[in-house]
Amino acid sequence: MEAARKALAVVAVLGAGGGVGSILFALVTPGELQKQLMLQEMPERDSRRRDEAVRTKELVMATLKDAAATKENVAWRRNWTVRGDGRSA
């Protein structure tokens, strides 16, 4: 009988903890309007940020292409925008 009482107490405590956690989660999550505002403020929505990301990806891809075409270890370059032959990427 004592084991059943302890098991019931454990189940009650765990259930209460789960209930409190669920209620707190429901209180903290943003509403639909707040989600829309957060999405509008994301950095990817800014055209300057997008252009900068595209340029960075282009530089990385040019560096990888250059690294594949040469035996030089391009990872040790101080300036990745300049190729080994002195031209700009």
Curated annotation (Swiss-Prot):
Name of this protein: Ubiquinol-cytochrome-c reductase complex assembly factor 3
GO molecular function: cardiolipin binding; phosphatidic acid binding
Region feature Mediates lipid-binding, mapped onto this chain: 23-80
Modification(s) after translation: Probably cleaved by OMA1 under mitochondrial stress conditions.
Annotated keywords: ATP synthesis, Membrane, Mitochondrion, Mitochondrion inner membrane, Transmembrane, Transmembrane helix
InterPro entries from the UniProt entry: UQCC3
Quaternary state and interactors: Associates with the ubiquinol-cytochrome c reductase complex (mitochondrial respiratory chain complex III(CIII) or cytochrome b-c1 complex). Interacts with UQCC1. Forms a complex, named COMC, composed of UQCC1, UQCC2; UQCC3 and UQCC4; mediates MT-CYB hemylation and association with the first nuclear-encoded complex III subunit UQCRQ.
UniProt function note: Required for the assembly of the ubiquinol-cytochrome c reductase complex (mitochondrial respiratory chain complex III or cytochrome b-c1 complex), mediating cytochrome b recruitment and probably stabilization within the complex. Thereby, plays an important role in ATP production by mitochondria. Cardiolipin-binding protein, it may also control the cardiolipin composition of mitochondria membranes and their morphology.
Membrane-traversing stretches: 8-28
Membrane topology type: Single-pass membrane protein
GO biological process assignments: ATP biosynthetic process; cristae formation; mitochondrial electron transport, ubiquinol to cytochrome c; mitochondrial respiratory chain complex III assembly
Mitochondrial intermembrane topological intervals: 29-89
Family to which the UniProt record says this protein belongs: Belongs to the UQCC3 family.
Disulphide bond pairs: none
Gene: Uqcc3
Domain of life of the organism encoding this protein: Eukaryota
Ranges per topology, Mitochondrial matrix: 1-7
